């Protein structure tokens, strides 16, 4: 029961059922949360993985951020790049590739040359941090989001992780100075999940902030990405490289219509004829504000 006032509602104490107790509780089933849950389970821990949506993958799948990049330390003095994300990430990529759902350059193509740039830039496999052209090719992976969901689910199930979908994190359970569990909102009401170790993999620090951790608030460009089908990418790339000045004019015109975008605002995907559009850029929105996010959705859909 709740007590209603003019400007607020006073919620009275409630009895919340404990629906799971495990060694480890991971909140958020994006790439980080799935990897944390699988790793803990393989080390012999009982694990509960909590996700608010009906699928796994977070921004990688539902958010359609369709390139795994920033996975290397660039080599110096003619030494090759060091791939720093291996282990479970490598398992993901290998399984995606087995489903024809991941594409990345072989080591011999990871060099700085115009030939390789033309071959791999539209896959997003370039060092975006370098401004000089051609940018070096590096180990990055273009993937299909639905395949990512399938691979995530397979790995979680095989690892024996207890998965709780459709469970929206609500608040941390804190005893003394320790987080000992979480409360989630579900269609059946609020439920408690307890654990000896609780991992925040929400992406927005929801769990840690709820537990009282200090944080800083920043601002970044909001983007509503999308995909286009029926694109002849071979012809598009050929036109770009054979008619560079005309292509630049068209590209500038497109970006003005879109409302701001990265230089490589469209990229190829493992699905033939389908491109990923990482745009438009929409600065000034608060990612914590429901009203701000609604406004961003309207702008992203309608310009």
Identify the residue ranges that each predicted region occupies.
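Conserved N-terminal/central alpha/beta ligand/cofactor-binding core
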Residues: 2-5, 13, 19-21, 45-46, ...
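N-terminal Rossmann-fold NAD(P) dinucleotide-binding loop
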Residues: 33
């Amino acid at each position: 029961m709740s007590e209603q006032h003019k400007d607020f509602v006073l919620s009275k104490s409630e009895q919340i059922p404990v629906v799971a107790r495990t060694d480890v509780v991971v909140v958020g089933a994006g790439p980080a949360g799935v990897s944390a849950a699988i790793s803990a389970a393989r080390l012999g821990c009982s694990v509960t993985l909590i996700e608010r949506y009906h699928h796994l993958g977070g921004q990688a799948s539902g958010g359609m951020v369709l390139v795994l990049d920033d996975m290397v330390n660039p080599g110096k003095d003619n030494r090759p790049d060091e791939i720093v994300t291996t282990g479970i990430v490598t398992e993901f990529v290998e399984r995606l590739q087995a489903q024809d759902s991941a594409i990345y350059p072989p080591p011999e193509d990871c060099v700085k040359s115009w030939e390789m740039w033309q071959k791999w830039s539209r896959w997003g496999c370039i060092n975006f941090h370098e401004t000089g052209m051609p940018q070096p090719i590096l180990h990055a992976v273009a993937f299909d989001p639905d395949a990512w969901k399938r691979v995530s689910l397979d790995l979680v199930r095989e690892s024996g992780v207890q998965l709780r979908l459709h469970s929206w994190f609500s608040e941390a359970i804190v005893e003394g100075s320790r987080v000992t569990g979480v409360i989630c909102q579900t269609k059946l009401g609020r439920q408690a999940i307890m654990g000896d170790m609780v991992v925040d993999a929400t992406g927005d620090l929801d769990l840690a902030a709820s537990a009282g951790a200090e944080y800083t608030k920043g601002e970044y460009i909001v983007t509503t990405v999308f995909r286009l089908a029926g694109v002849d990418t071979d012809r598009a790339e050929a036109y770009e490289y054979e008619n560079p000045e005309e292509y630049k004019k068209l590209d500038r015109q497109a970006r003005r219509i879109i409302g701001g975008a990265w230089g490589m605002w469209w990229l190829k995907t493992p699905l033939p004829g389908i491109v990923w559009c990482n745009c438009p850029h929409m600065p000034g929105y608060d990612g914590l504000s429901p009203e701000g996010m609604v406004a961003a959705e309207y702008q992203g859909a309608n310009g």
